[in-house]
Amino acid sequence: MSRGVPPFVLLLMLSLLAAPVAAQQTHILVITGLSGDPAFAEEFHTWATTLLDAATDRYELPAENVTYLAEKTDADPARIDNRSTQENVEQAFADLAERAQPDDYVLVLLIGHGSYDRGESRFNLLGRDLTAKDYA
């Protein structure tokens, strides 16, 4: 079922990694939400790891600049840092805010399903789903 990473995602990543200023660093946070189906879970993981492999292997982004949260850590325990819950997402953003400097590049990629209710969009996570306001 995997169709690879959408080309616009790779293009965005390449533009962030291609020619950073010497003092600048790139940080990547990838969050895969609830899959709802094993086939989607596999596809989300493939998209996430394809992007992360390109960043770390091809563009030599340091592993400490990468955070990957997913629905199930047992899908790839060596690479998935934690489960994609509200608490872990908030902690990942707090950690990123501590590490990233003002001129650094930060890429946050949300892979998954969303919902829309009463005028508010949400990204589906384990537990409470987060809104755009939660990510601001």
Predicted regions and their residues:
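Cysteine protease catalytic core and zymogen-processing segment of caspase-like enzymes
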Residues: 115-136
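Short, charged beta->alpha transition segments
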Residues: 7, 93-96, 135
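N-terminal secretory signal peptides that target proteins for export/translocation
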Residues: 1-3
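A generic membrane alpha-helix/interface feature
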Residues: 5-6, 45, 78, 129-130
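Bacterial N-terminal signal peptides
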Residues: 7-19
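Boundary/activation segment at the start of structured domains
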Residues: 17-109, 114-117, 121
